[in-house]
Amino acid sequence: MAMPEFTLRQLLEAGVHFGHHTRRWNPRMAPFIFGVRNQVHILDLQQTVPLLDRSLRAIRDVVAGGGRVLFVGTKRAAAEYVAESAQRCGQYYVNHRWLGGMLTNWKTITGSIKRLRQIDEMLAGDTTGLTKKEVLDITRDREKLERALGGIKDMGGLPDILFIIDTNKEKLAVEEANKLGIPVVAVLDSNSDPSGVTYPIPGNDDAIRAITMYCDLVASAVLDGISAEMIASGRDLGAAEELAPEILPEPEAEQATA
């Protein structure tokens, strides 16, 4: 594996440079704005390129050191891609709703995850002693917990870095990460507040093509970090038990399924 590559042209084609209408801007984003076109702020891709590369390397280095990455994106345009990308690289995600205390009150969240596991075991076992209504109520509880916690139920502890799409919507996630000293990588549109973001990526946070590109690049950086960690520890990639074959590099995936 190698660090993911991208070009300024690819960013342009994905619409990364398009900000919001000038009325909706956040003055703190002024240093990252190139100009105005048709009353829309244009983000400076000459800054985005090195900042995106820096962010990807930060994520890669965290993973290479054995760290966990939490993908966060609950807006409709991002939710699906956030989950898919995190799963593809064996990491974790929140794509439904950020619950208050998801990081700062991890002990309580762990209790809810335990409850989810208990329900899974209950429904997988013999339910003949329960009424249809009881089974239905339990199933609804499970669905609610799965939506909220399904992406972090196997995380096993606090993440080591966050990747966030839309810091306005995920303001609480940024605040909780800041309180705990967890670094934040985030896409910042022209209406975003860069405060509390360790690794800013100036770019459109609404266009599906742009969101898909960010998620794919971050997932690839994670996979490169996993490869680096395994090489450093002298392990054979093909013998890794924790990763699904589809997220291993092709030669190793073939060995894992052979």
From Swiss-Prot:
Keywords linked to the UniProt accession: Ribonucleoprotein, Ribosomal protein
Entry's Gene Ontology BP terms: translation
HAMAP family: Ribosomal_uS2_B
A GO term for molecular function: structural constituent of ribosome
Gene Ontology CC: one annotated term: cytosolic small ribosomal subunit
Family, as annotated: Belongs to the universal ribosomal protein uS2 family.
SUPFAM superfamilies hit by this protein: Ribosomal protein S2
Family annotation (NCBIfam families): rpsB_bact
Stored PROSITE patterns: RIBOSOMAL_S2_1, RIBOSOMAL_S2_2
Entries under Gene3D superfamilies matching the protein: Glucose-6-phosphate isomerase like protein, domain 1, Helix hairpin bin
UniProt-recorded name of the protein: Small ribosomal subunit protein uS2
Biological classification of the source: Bacteria, Pseudomonadati, Pseudomonadota, Alphaproteobacteria, Acetobacterales
A Pfam match: Ribosomal_S2
